[in-house]
Every structure is written in C-alpha cells, then in structure tokens.
Amino acid sequence: YSQALIRAETLVPGAGREAIEPLLSEASLSVTGADVQTDRVVLDGTAYCQAVYRQGEETTLRALTAQATLSQVIEVSGAAPGMLVRVNAQVEHVESKYENGHMVFLITCGLRAQVLQLRQTELIDAISGVEDIQTVYGELRSCKLAADTDADVLVKGEIALPVALDARTSLMDWGAATIESAEAELGGLRVKGKV
C-alpha cells in the first residue's frame, strides 16, 4: 500500500479581484500503465478533477475541470520483470482552493499493487513399488489465462430532470460502472452492467 499526493490546477476564467469560493470538488483516478521492475512497480495514470464555485456576489454557480498525471513507484519485495500485476487505485480525499487566478486541487490517492508469478508444477498421480508410504493430500487450484484484451464502449442515455430544478447548465459530471455478469460467447465475452 502506498499513498500519493497529486496537485492539479487550472486557470479560473474571468477571475479578477472578486472572491472565488469553491463549493464542491470531486476527483477520479485512472491508472493507464503498470510496469513491474526489480522489487518495485511503477504506476502511470491521470487524475481528473472538477469543482463548482461561486465568483464574487454572483448568484449563479460556475464549474471547471482540471487534470494531472500520476507517476508513482510502489516498493514490492520480490517483484521481478515479467510478473503479472494487479493494481487498485482510489481517491481518498480531494480539496480545492483558489490561488492567484488558479483553482488548485490536492488529491490524496491510495494505491495497492500485487504481483503474481506463474510457475510450472508437476503432478504425481500414481506411486508403485513402494510399501508403507505416508501420503498427505492437498487441494491444488490451477488457473490458465486463455485470453487478454481491452475494449472501449460508449454508453449514452438521458435522465429527465424535474422542471422545479431549473437546470440549464451541467456543472459537474461523474459516473461509475458496475459489472453484473460476464458470459462467454463465440469469439468473445458479453459483459452486462449498470452505469
């Protein structure tokens, strides 16, 4: 487990001498690469940030976005090039503040990396010609990676908002995907879920 502090900033449009008051901030983290090296894993990714703020005495709210790159090394004793790696990255805390015409985001991320090594094992299924042998039985689980691929999908939909909200502008956008099932199909895999 490792923690990383990421700083992202963006110019606040139209900012002058008026006070800028951040009201709400949100961030998400995407890991785009994981390289296993000797006794460590190098992670690369991007942090995406959004904030809603008020400028001066205005009654309308404004929003902006920013992003920053992540490059973090996690020490993993026994790791070696060629091993498989699993990574879990999540945003633990995010805050935004206004500094000299810029909205600054400070994002605290929690990172976990697990390395796996494949090794060959021989199974003994019979012994003959020996008497009085003591045996111990154990359960062996074997997994074989049959295929590995990536796929992108565009999900589009609409939600009707009540008229009472008087929502004319989208201030912040975020979403999460949940996989409910994965079934093998001829030539591929059908994944079903919700956003």
For the regions a protein language model found, what residue spans apply to each?
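Viral structural modules
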Residues: 1-194
